[in-house]
């Protein structure tokens, strides 16, 4: 019995499908290798960051001991970063502080943002002081905020940072591939801090456990909650996170 000949179009279609399947298989192998390499990079960076944080902490402890042994005082480095929380609503806000709150992206009560501390931003914070609480966040505070409340601004949408791929797609061109890269850039106020910080949507916090103080709108040093509370911002954020 004579074999059935396939029409030329079917032969071409079969070859094209086979070629497409081979290309997809090859692309999958490349993608898997790339993802494996990327995971290794992310893992190695996270380990390097942890060593960097630990070494810096030990260096400060040693410097304090050396200063004490020499009969002098250790002076902390000037803070480069603050975390700012809006604690007062929209009623009776003068135009200038209202504008500052808009510049800081603090458009809602209990919203929080990171701010690079400079002479200019220090002046802005003073103008908005009756409406905000701020201070110097530690690594633990930054990490808990980003992991628990972190959202990115993607096409004007608020998107949860549920996957490193989201971060890489938006910040990869700055070398920020993972959530630990993002935390490191914020904590160290790195060269791409502006891009990393602008990517972060303002944090939406809750009212603190037990509420604010009864003299909430007095300055912190007067028994209230507004203004610069330095390292004590970490306790407030923990209550609100």
From Swiss-Prot:
Keywords: Ribonucleoprotein, Ribosomal protein. It comes from the Eukaryota. GO terms for biological process: maturation of LSU-rRNA from tricistronic rRNA transcript (SSU-rRNA, 5.8S rRNA, LSU-rRNA). InterPro entries: Ribo_uL30_ferredoxin-like_sf, Ribosomal_uL30, Ribosomal_uL30_euk, Ribosomal_uL30_euk_arc, Ribosomal_uL30_ferredoxin-like, Ribosomal_uL30_N_euk. Residues 1-25 are annotated as: Disordered. It holds the Pfam family Ribosomal_L30_N. GO terms for molecular function: RNA binding; structural constituent of ribosome. One of its GO terms (cellular component) is cytosolic large ribosomal subunit. NCBIfam families: uL30_euk. Belongs to the universal ribosomal protein uL30 family. PANTHER family: 60S RIBOSOMAL PROTEIN L7 (PTHR11524), LARGE RIBOSOMAL SUBUNIT PROTEIN UL30 (PTHR11524:SF16). This is Large ribosomal subunit protein uL30. It comes from Debaryomyces hansenii (strain ATCC 36239 / CBS 767 / BCRC 21394 / JCM 1990 / NBRC 0083 / IGC 2968) (Yeast). The gene is RPL7.
């Amino acid at each position: 019995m004579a074999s059935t000949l396939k029409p030329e179009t079917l032969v071409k279609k079969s070859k094209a499908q086979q070629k497409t399947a081979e290309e997809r298989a090859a692309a999958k192998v490349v993608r898997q290798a790339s993802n494996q390499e990327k995971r290794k990079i992310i893992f190695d960076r996270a380990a390097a960051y942890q060593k960097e944080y630990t070494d810096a902490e030990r260096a400060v402890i040693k410097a304090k001991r050396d200063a004490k042994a020499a009969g002098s005082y250790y002076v902390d480095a000037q803070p480069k970063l603050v975390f700012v929380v809006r604690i007062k609503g929209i009623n009776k806000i003068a135009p200038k502080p209202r504008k500052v709150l808009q510049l800081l992206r603090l458009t809602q009560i209990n919203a929080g943002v990171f701010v690079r501390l400079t002479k200019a931003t220090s002046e802005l914070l003073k103008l908005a002081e009756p409406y905000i609480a701020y201070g110097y966040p530690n690594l633990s505070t930054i990490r808990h905020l980003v992991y628990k409340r972190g959202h990115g601004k993607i096409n004007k949408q608020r998107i949860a940072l549920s996957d490193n791929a989201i971060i890489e797609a938006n910040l990869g061109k700055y070398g920020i591939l993972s959530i630990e890269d993002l935390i490191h850039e914020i904590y160290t106020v790195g060269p791409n801090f502006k891009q990393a910080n602008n990517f972060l949507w303002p944090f939406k916090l809750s009212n603190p456990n037990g509420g604010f103080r009864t003299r909430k709108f007095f300055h912190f040093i007067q028994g209230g909650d507004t203004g610069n509370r330095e390292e004590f911002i970490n306790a407030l954020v923990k209550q609100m996170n």
